[in-house]
Swiss-Prot record:
This is Protein translocase subunit SecA. Residues 853-927 are annotated as: Disordered. It comes from the Bacteria. Monomer and homodimer. Part of the essential Sec protein translocation apparatus which comprises SecA, SecYEG and auxiliary proteins SecDF. Other proteins may also be involved. Belongs to the SecA family. HAMAP family: SecA. It comes from Kocuria rhizophila (strain ATCC 9341 / DSM 348 / NBRC 103217 / DC2201). PANTHER family: CHLOROPLAST PROTEIN-TRANSPORTING ATPASE, SECA INNER MEMBRANE COMPONENT OF SEC PROTEIN SECRETION SYSTEM. Keywords: ATP-binding, Cell membrane, Cytoplasm, Membrane, Nucleotide-binding, Protein transport, Translocase, Translocation, Transport. GO terms for cellular component: cell envelope Sec protein transport complex; cytosol; plasma membrane. It is a peripheral membrane protein.
């Protein structure tokens, strides 16, 4: 199906390209007339465009003129003129396509035209990048074009105060990372006042490196969590000790490919003996299974100095693909705590989910979505199925002159790396720059040691120098440069032969103390001379590198995805420059060992140690292994989306209701409806069966008093009905609802109408804030065990949808009940405000001091980061990653004095999903 869809999508490319070419021709026809405009006249075009949009003119019709204005502005401010293919790429973005443009085609400049055009409507444009550095760099550089045309540019960075973020979002065009945009959306839906909101809608997004963000990172949802109750540390340490006594294969199984573990019968018996329990799988022992599985994972699947390092008494994750220490990030679902127990360091607490969304569903919020990347065609079908956006391949400005050489495969790693070092030495000696891609930090450091022994000067991008990443990558095209990096490191930074003059110019301006925002006039005045000096310095070296053969990209291992391999190759041969690429592999590489072990083992048996192996078997083996991984990952993303779609429908209901309350809507009628439903349900439960003489009116009144202060007595109601036999459920409801209305009006008269409306909003927000995280917990717990339904011949997804809907209805009923109970029973203190009388004192909900943010890294692996949210503790703590206990915002009812005997908190029965105490543990599977 996917391959058929890909063919259909490719067929449509020609029609789209024809349309884009028409737009480019129209822009070209306007170029001379825009060149004749003065700076002031060119800037005035922006106001003219806005007036035409206000009069009803469409953006499509305005495109040629707006693009021509941006082209001329970029030429005057940056010294860069949009090529025709860049205009075509920009038009594709405006039309809501993903533009596939090869490395070096100037994608950053491409985004300026559609961003400007769409910003004219006044609804904001978001430009999404892969990291904070690129967001800030692009906002500063391209912001010069926008400011020249009279638009404001903002940038969202980690650690910014809400007031600063709100200001940045108010700009016409805002740069930032997918995680920052997504977390701001979630935080807005956790806000307690309108003043706390920072985003202003989701109009149009341009996603840079769109495949990385919407594909690679889409397996992991964004999660905001706060510490859960319970003491699990003892069990983490206990099981860290227990698993040391268990043996792989005998007591448990490990699947490295799927990164899963399973406990075998002998292992279960040993654990039961150690813990002194009869049956590990009894319901009361179920949480222990999660601790056991995580302890085995920590022992077998996570290695020190590869997946993480231990520094300063903390376990710090190392991103295997970028080589960076992910400061403050943590594995979720108890895995990080299990590793901490294994390493004998302090165990930080687990957390409870407070808000979550997948990247797929976040980006579906935008009215229009587009993106750019050098490698999208392989995922065209998934982009269409998931996001309903097509991929169009934009032709390069100049043909690609890079020579992609055939893979060289050795029997083992030692001979492979010996050949790699020889090849690097030869290239280095003739002055050809070399970019070496490795699969992990461990491998990059190993290769670095080999190069050092041979006296080859080189730079290494790893956990120890990630702060210099962009600078190192930008200069990786200089004569004789050797740069060793993990495959994904430095993505988004252009490698220019002879050095990156523009990058050097930005650095030079910073050295001169000039800021593009603060010193806009002086910055613009000095830029041309600084850029010219940097260009002259790199021009002669550029020619020398061209003669040496251009950039040589050497891959030391194939990535799981063909797309990542293509990205690595694509670093060479930009803008028609010469270049080469080659992969050196070994039969013991992870990809071959895990995903095509049969082919690898057969070749290992016959291959000589120091002679490279070639042939169709190798090529097909690699392709087969990559297809397996890509298929598995695509299935995971599809599965994540299916289940999140269920939760997304619920989230939309909650967030829409919450936003309405937050914006100050009058919810008096909604509260009245809540009261009717809660009381009617309470009455129906106790009068639905039997004759009136059999009804337990005393029990009913006890239940009613737990909801509101009833002023009627059972005898008064019976007398009003004309006797017990004539009593009906409808009559009871009429009397009780009338009484409740009177009592509520009395309360409103006591507090004042305005204060009552405010109290209604605050209480309902608070109850939603308490119940929604509880529901997320229950849904997560349901999802963990739902796969077992397949054993009973039932579709797990259908079961999840059915039970999830029932749980959502329970939660909504619980919200209604708790809101009504709190409004009737909450004791509200008054303050004297002079002769005018009393004012109601409403305490703000308690705020957590810290929250944990879980998000995918560049390859989609989930990691968590802890950040202070308390105004007095705003400083971001990700550098040391120390999480601090925090609780969710509390219900005003929970933090205020209530009349004794009139609270709903001591009711015997709670409607809806109840929150479990203690840390959540995965359900185990006996094998």
């Amino acid at each position: 199906m996917a391959s058929f869809l890909e063919k259909v999508l490719r067929t449509g490319d020609k029609r789209v390209l024809k349309r884009l070419r028409t737009y480019a021709d129209a822009v070209n026809s306007l170029e001379d007339s825009f060149k004749e405009l003065s700076d002031a006249e060119l800037r005035a075009e922006t106001d003219a465009f806005r007036e035409r949009i206000a009069d009803g003119e469409s953006l499509d019709r305005l495109l040629p003129e707006a693009f021509a204005a941006v082209r001329e502005a970029a030429s005057r401010t940056l010294g860069q003129r949009h090529f025709d293919v860049q205009i075509m790429g920009g038009a594709a973005l405006h039309l809501g396509y993903i533009a596939e443009m090869k490395t070096g085609e100037g994608k950053t400049l491409v985004a300026t035209a559609p961003a400007y055009l769409n910003a004219l409507a006044g609804k904001g444009v978001h430009v999404v990048t892969v990291n904070d550095y690129l967001a800030e760099y692009q906002a500063n550089l391209m912001g010069r074009v926008y400011r020249f045309l009279g638009l404001e540019t903002g940038v969202i960075l980690g650690g910014q105060e809400p007031a600063v973020r709100r200001e940045q979002y108010a700009a016409d065009i805002t740069y930032g990372t997918n995680n920052e945009f997504g977390f701001d959306y979630l935080r807005d839906n956790m806000a307690w006042t309108e003043d706390e909101l920072v985003q202003r809608g989701h109009n149009f997004a341009i996603v840079d490196e769109v495949d990385s963000i919407l594909i690679d990172e889409a397996r992991t949802p964004l999660i905001i969590s706060g510490p859960a109750s319970g003491e699990a540390n003892r069990w983490y340490r206990e099981f860290a000790t227990v698993v040391q006594k268990l043996s792989p294969e005998t007591d448990y199984e490990v699947d490295e490919k799927k990164r899963t573990v399973g406990v075998l019968e002998p292992g279960i018996e040993k654990v039961e003996d150690w813990l002194g329990i009869d049956n590990l799988y009894e319901s009361r022992n179920t949480p222990l299974i999660g601790f056991l599985n995580n302890a085995i994972k920590a022992k077998e699947l996570f290695r020190n100095n590869k997946d993480y390092i231990v520094a300063g008494g903390e376990v710090k994750i190392v991103d295997e693909h970028t080589g960076r220490v992910l400061a403050g990030r943590r594995y979720n679902e108890g895995v990080h705590q299990a590793i901490e127990a294994k390493e004998g360091v302090e165990i930080k607490p687990e957390n409870q989910t407070m808000a979550t969304i997948t990247l797929q569903n976040y980006f579906r919020l935008y009215d229009k979505l587009s993106g750019m990347t050098g490698t999208a065609q392989t995922e065209a079908a998934e982009f269409m199925n998931t996001y309903e956006i097509g991929v169009v391949a934009i032709p390069p400005h100049r043909g690609i002159a890079r020579e992609d050489k055939r893979d060289v495969v050795y029997k083992n790693e030692a001979t492979k790396y010996a050949a790699v070092v020889r090849d690097i030495e030869e290239r280095h000696e003739k002055g050809q720059p070399v970019l070496v891609g490795t699969a992990s930090v461990e491998k990059s450091e190993y290769l670095s040691r080999l190069l050092a022994k041979r006296g080859v000067r080189h730079e290494v991008l790893n956990a120890k120098n990630h702060a210099r990443e962009a600078a190192i990558v930008a200069q990786a095209g200089r004569k004789g440069a050797v740069t060793v990096a993990t495959n994904m490191a430095g993505r988004g930074t252009d490698i220019m032969l002879g050095g990156n003059a523009e990058f050097n110019a930005v650095d030079r301006m910073a050295e001169l103390g000039l800021d593009p925002e603060r010193d806009a006039e002086e910055y613009e005045a000095r830029w041309p001379e600084v850029l010219k000096a940097c260009e002259e310095a790199t021009r002669s070296e550029h020619e020398e590198v061209l003669e040496a053969g251009g950039l040589y990209v050497l891959g030391t291992e194939r990535h799981e995805s063909r797309r990542i391999d293509n990205q690595l190759r694509g670093r060479s041969g930009r803008q028609g420059d010469p270049g080469e690429s080659r992969f050196y592999l070994s039969l013991s590489d992870d990809l071959m060992r895990l995903f095509n072990p049969g082919a690898a083992q057969r070749l290992m048996a016959i291959a000589p140690d120091d002679v490279p192996v070639t042939g169709r078997l190798i090529t097909s083996g690699i392709a087969n292994a990559q297809n397996q991984v890509e298929g598995r990952n695509a299935e995971q993303r599809k599965n994540v989306l299916k289940y999140d779609d269920v939760l997304n429908r619920q989230r939309e209901v909650i967030y829409k209701d919450r936003k309405r309350i937050l914006m100050g809507d009058d919810i008096e009628d909604q509260i009245r409806q809540f009261t009717e439903e809660v009381l009617s349900s309470t009455i129906a439960e106790r009068t639905g069966k039997g004759h009136p003489e059999d009804w337990d009116l005393d029990g009913l009144w006890e239940a009613l008093r737990a909801v509101y202060p009833v002023s009627l007595t059972p005898d008064e109601v019976v007398e009003e009905a004309g006797g017990r036999p004539r009593l009906t459920s409808d009559f009871l409801q009429e009397q009780i609802l009338s009484d409740a209305t009177v009592m509520y009006l009395e309360r409103e008269e006591e507090l004042g109408s305005e204060a009552m409306r405010n109290l209604e909003r605050r209480v309902l927000l608070s109850v939603i804030g308490q119940r929604w995280p509880e529901h997320l917990y229950e849904m997560d717990y349901l999802k963990e065990g739902i796969g077992l339904r397949a054993m009973a011949q039932r579709d797990p997804l259908v079961e999840y949808q059915r039970e999830g809907h029932a749980m959502f209805q329970d939660m909504m009923a619980a919200i209604r009940e708790q809101t009504v109970v709190t409004l009737f029973n909450l004791e509200v203190r008054k303050q004297r405000t002079g002769a005018a009388g009393g004012a109601v004192e409403l305490s703000a909900p308690q705020r957590p001091a810290f929250l944990q943010y879980t998000a995918p890294d560049e390859d989609g692996t989930p990691h968590a980061e802890v950040e202070a949210v308390d105004p007095g503790a705003r400083e971001r703590t990700s550098e040391d990653g120390t999480p601090t206990d925090a609780s969710a915002g509390t219900d005003p009812a929970a933090s205020s004095d209530r009349p004794e005997g009139e609270t709903g908190g001591n009711r015997a029965k709670r409607r809806g999903a109840s929150a479990r105490s203690g840390s959540k543990a995965k359900r185990g599977k006996r094998r």
